[in-house]
Design a protein with these regions (language model features):
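Conserved helix-loop-beta segment at the catalytic/binding core of cyclic-nucleotide signaling proteins
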Residues: 1-19
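A structural signal for short, well-ordered beta-strand segments
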Residues: 9, 60-66, 138
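Active-site loop/short helix in cyclic nucleotide turnover domains
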Residues: 13-17, 68-78
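Alpha-helical scaffold within the catalytic cores of cyclic-nucleotide enzymes
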Residues: 15, 19-62, 87-100, 120
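Allosteric regulatory "coupling" segments in signal-transduction proteins
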Residues: 23, 80-85, 124
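TPR-repeat structural position
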Residues: 23, 172-173
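Cytosolic regulatory/linker segments at or just downstream of nucleotide-handling modules
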Residues: 69, 98-168, 180-187
């Protein structure tokens, strides 16, 4: 963990110690956080109910990106912090914001996807990010190896790919049909 900024937690992998599986470790940490959220909310709800308070569930969105950054002690002689800076750090923050837009828990960039092993992912969109000249392809993490190996997920992914192709080609009826089919496959 690098720092807490309001309701944001910033963390990074692969520094100061090399970690060849840093993309996997980042995504696995994100998945572990999401897995812990449901029981945590159940605990908070039980406490709120026992005290007669309104229950307000905790919800989080996570953005991960992989890339080249500036890492090291930042600041002055009087005050410094070991941290990371750079475009790829900023993109991770923007991806976190997209989790709410797309209604998913974990959003990752294409560079992170390229380094993952055994994770179930779905492409979300080609997104024009403020401050970038080229759009970036974004994906969501649906689960781990267990989900990736399920026939139901593989069918859903194929339907999802067809839906995205129809959407990109502005074939709206076809895109909606694929979307409906995907919803039925998830049920």
């Amino acid at each position: 963990i690098d720092e807490y900024m309001g309701d944001c937690i910033m963390a990074f992998w692969n520094a100061p110690v090399d970690d060849k599986s840093h993309a996997d470790h980042g995504v696995e940490s994100a998945m572990a956080m999401m897995a812990r959220l449901k029981p945590l909310n159940e605990e908070i709800k039980a406490e709120a109910d026992a005290e007669g308070r309104k229950f307000i569930p905790l919800a989080i969105g996570i953005g991960l990106n992989t890339g080249v950054v500036c890492v090291g002690n930042m600041g002055s002689d009087q005050r410094f912090d070991y941290s990371v800076l750079g475009d790829d750090v900023n993109l991770a923050a923007r991806l976190e914001g997209q989790s709410k837009t797309y209604g998913v828990d974990i959003v990752i960039g294409a560079n992170t996807l390229a380094q993952l092993t055994d994770k179930a992912t779905l492409e979300l969109d080609l997104l024009q990010v403020r401050g970038k000249t080229k759009p970036v392809r974004i994906h969501c993490v649906a689960g781990g190896k267990d989900l990736l190996e399920r026939e139901k997920f593989l069918q859903l992914r194929e339907t999802h790919i067809k839906m995205l192709a129809a959407y990109a080609g502005q074939r709206w009826d076809e895109a909606f049909e694929s979307l409906d089919k995907g919803r039925k496959e998830m049920a």
